[in-house]
């Protein structure tokens, strides 16, 4: 199991430690041992209720390497897992590591390039939309992903499902990555949409009512298939609470993807690649 650092992994509000349980519980393919420093109060929003036991970060935390970010190869795919909560701004340790990783990817060996991180770059949902971990990623990471023809950017954070068409700078473009939010695996949240009636032009599928999981099959160097399978939903509210779980194991979204690396279009304009 390969996972990405989430806001729920930033540890207990009383310890001021970063990622201690996350480092001890999981073992990812380390680039090098983790570098973690104690947090300071100004890094976090503190919960207003006594039972709020973990941090909500408002800026980047002092956590590098270890389980925070890493990469691995699986068959014909190169996977790069990033930390949304370690700085990824230009010149940061993580950003420099990411650039080095991407520059050394051999697409003749691993033609599929997949990025995973907790916070999405694109979201049709209202919650978290102003967090810097999303807004700054669009500014500083999207141009890098586009330049290197990343195929998929897979995230969570929002407890719902979303799939975009290949997108560059908020416009459908066959050369751009497909952005997926697969955050509806367990927690019911009914994330509100930014616009209830009309989805953004880069949206292909969005859903905030179902639980589910996704699968990605890589058939060859040019074609892959993504599926989102729903597992159920909560019935109508009962007494102000979420209703009883209703199983429903049916296919809810399926798409065949042509590897963007082989899309023959005009070169991507230089201004789209600026960091």
Please provide the spans of the model-predicted regions.
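Active-site glycine-centered loops adjacent to acidic/histidine catalytic or metal-binding residues
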Residues: 6-7, 118, 156-157
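ATP-dependent adenylate-handling ligase core
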Residues: 122
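Extended active-site neighborhood of metal-dependent phosphoesterases/phosphodiesterases
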Residues: 1-113, 128-141, 162-207, 212-217
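Binuclear metal-dependent phosphoesterase catalytic core
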Residues: 170-270, 275
């Amino acid at each position: 199991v390969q996972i990405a650092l989430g806001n729920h992994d930033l540890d207990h509000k009383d310890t001021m430690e970063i990622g201690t349980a996350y480092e001890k519980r999981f073992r990812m393919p380390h680039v090098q041992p983790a570098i973690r420093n104690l947090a300071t109060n100004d890094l976090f929003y503190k919960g207003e209720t006594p039972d709020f036991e973990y941090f909500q970060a408002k800026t980047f935390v002092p956590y590098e390497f270890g389980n925070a970010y890493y990469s691995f190869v699986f068959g014909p795919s190169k996977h790069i897992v990033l930390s949304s909560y370690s700085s990824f701004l230009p010149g940061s340790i993580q950003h420099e590591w990411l650039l080095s990783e991407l520059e050394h990817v051999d697409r003749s060996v691993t033609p599929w390039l997949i990025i995973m991180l907790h916070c999405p770059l694109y979201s049709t949902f209202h919650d978290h939309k102003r967090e810097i971990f999303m807004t700054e990623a669009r500014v500083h990471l999207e141009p890098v992903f586009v330049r290197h023809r990343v195929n998929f950017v897979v995230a969570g954070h929002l407890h719902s499902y979303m799939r975009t068409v290949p997108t560059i700078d908020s416009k459908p473009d066959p050369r751009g990555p497909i952005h997926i939010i697969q955050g509806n695996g367990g927690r019911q949240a009914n994330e509100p949409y930014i616009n209830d009636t009309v989805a953004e032009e880069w949206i292909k599928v969005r859903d905030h009512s179902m639980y589910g999981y996704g699968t990605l099959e890589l058939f060859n160097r040019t074609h892959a298939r993504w599926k989102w399978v729903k597992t159920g939903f909560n019935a109508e509210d009962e007494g102000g609470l979420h209703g009883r779980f209703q199983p429903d194991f049916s296919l809810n979204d399926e798409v065949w993807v042509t590897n963007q690396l082989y899309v023959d279009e005009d070169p991507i304009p230089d201004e789209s690649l600026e960091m």
